[in-house]
From Swiss-Prot:
The keyword Transferase applies. GO terms for biological process: queuosine biosynthetic process; tRNA wobble guanine modification; tRNA-guanine transglycosylation. Pathway: tRNA modification; tRNA-queuosine biosynthesis. The active site is at D90 (proton acceptor), D267 (nucleophile). It comes from Borrelia turicatae (strain 91E135). This is Queuine tRNA-ribosyltransferase. It catalyses: 7-aminomethyl-7-carbaguanine + guanosine(34) in tRNA = 7-aminomethyl-7-carbaguanosine(34) in tRNA + guanine. Pfam families: TGT. Keywords: Glycosyltransferase, Metal-binding, Queuosine biosynthesis, Transferase, tRNA processing, Zinc. GO terms for cellular component: cytosol. Coiled coil: none annotated. Catalyzes the base-exchange of a guanine (G) residue with the queuine precursor 7-aminomethyl-7-deazaguanine (PreQ1) at position 34 (anticodon wobble position) in tRNAs with GU(N) anticodons (tRNA-Asp, -Asn, -His and -Tyr). Catalysis occurs through a double-displacement mechanism. The nucleophile active site attacks the C1' of nucleotide 34 to detach the guanine base from the RNA, forming a covalent enzyme-RNA intermediate. The proton acceptor active site deprotonates the incoming PreQ1, allowing a nucleophilic attack on the C1' of the ribose to form the product. Substrate binds at D90, S91, G92, G93, F94, D144, Q190, G217.
Length: 375
């Protein structure tokens, strides 16, 4: 299922291979977010060309639209979307709990109001697992409570206890899954930013012995030093034999931090979201193409990049497309940013293999953070 190929000598970074129903995934792995089973402005064949083996889709959004019955009719999410690589499906917990004024958390589950039409719905750990079983997801995420940064201890403790209870119920459902379905279950640790709650949560989750472990509830608006503190602490509590996943991190420095502390999988909408607004990832930081200085710029966005944008088009032309709100501009910028993330991960893997990841991370971050294009 998960094999470690090499450990870095100077950090907890490691190379691994995750065996999933729709093929092998090399780790560390950045997972693009295709919320509704598709990447915004990127066709499947472009993703395949870029080397994407694992895409995230969201159970909450797919449940609301097109609906579980539609996907069930097709036999799986893979059949419905014509994507023959792997899917990780998020439980939808983050989306439900971000509704704030439109949901009610109970020990049994969560009652919430649709953001689309205001209709009311109820999720339980069992129902969320069943949906992902219908999807035939390659990685299934348990329903959890992602609490906000800054809540008090008692509330964080309550949410941690409920998450653990839901993890037990999800595991029972997983153990009784339909015959022939071999997706992997990842249970989620919580605890907010309290170390004793993190320890309690992680120990309880580890007792359940799920195939994979996710660290939830970080990168939710906290300062970077607090993020690093909890990332390092929570990761250290999880045995190295388990594949580790941190949800919702997608900036280069956060990802390299995660790799340093032994995280194998991460995802974020950030690369494509910022692309739609004209922000391009480069080794010198973020290039904001809408700036007037790029109007007459005949250079590619990045000289050593082999994506469609950089091998064919200029900064000036991309600026024209983005400023004119042309779809092609968004497509090119999105492809570039996803290609950039995959290229960064490949560089990190090579550095781990060569035994100089710590040096690579330090040099990369000094260049990225001090780049000419940062505001």
């Amino acid at each position: 299922m998960f094999s470690i190929i090499k450990n870095d000598k100077n950090s907890n970074a490691r190379l691994g291979v995750l065996e999933l129903p729709h093929g092998k995934v090399e780790t560390p792995c950045f997972m693009p977010v295709g919320t509704l089973g598709a990447m915004k402005a990127l066709k499947h064949d472009v993703l395949e060309k870029l080397g994407c083996d694992l895409m995230l889709a969201n159970t909450y959004h797919l449940y609301l639209r097109p609906g579980i019955d539609v996907i069930k009719k097709y036999g799986s999410l893979h059949n419905f979307t014509a994507w023959d690589k792997n899917f990780l499906t998020d439980s939808g917990g983050f989306q439900v709990f971000s509704l704030a004024n439109f949901r009610k958390i109970e020990t049994e589950g969560v009652d919430f109001k649709s953001h689309i039409d205001g209709s009311r719905h109820y999720f339980t750990p069992e129902s969320v697992f069943k949906m992902q079983e219908i999807f035939e997801s390659d990685i299934i995420m348990a329903l959890d409570i992602c609490s906000s940064y800054g809540i008090d201890y008692s509330e964080a403790s309550l949410y941690t206890n409920i998450t653990t209870s839901w993890a037990r119920r999800t595991l029972r459902a997983y153990e009784n899954r339909k015959e022939g379905y071999d997706g992997l279950l990842f249970l989620i640790t919580q605890g907010n930013f309290f170390k004793d709650l993190r320890k309690r949560s992680t120990e309880a989750i580890l007792e359940l012995d799920s195939p994979g472990i996710a660290i939830g509830g970080i990168s939710v608006g906290e300062p970077r030093d607090k993020y690093l503190e909890i990332l390092e602490y929570n990761s250290s509590l999880i045995p190295k034999v388990k594949p580790k996943y941190v949800m919702g991190i997608g900036t280069p420095h956060y990802i390299l931090d995660a790799i340093y502390y032994g995280i194998d999988i991460f995802d974020c909408v950030n690369p494509t979201r910022i692309a739609r607004h004209g922000s391009l990832l480069t080794d010198n930081g973020i290039l904001r193409i809408k700036r007037a200085e790029f109007n007459f710029d005949t250079c590619p966005v990045e000289r050593d990049c082999s994506c469609t944008l950089c091998t064919r088009y200029s900064r000036g032309y991309l600026r024209h497309l983005i400023k004119s709100e042309e779809t092609l501009g968004v497509m090119l910028a999105s492809e570039h940013n996803i290609h950039y993330m995959f290229r960064l991960i490949k560089k990190a893997r090579n550095a781990i293999m060569n035994g100089d990841f710590t040096k690579f991370r330090k040099l990369y971050l000094s260049k990225y953070d001090e780049g000419n294009f940062d505001e």
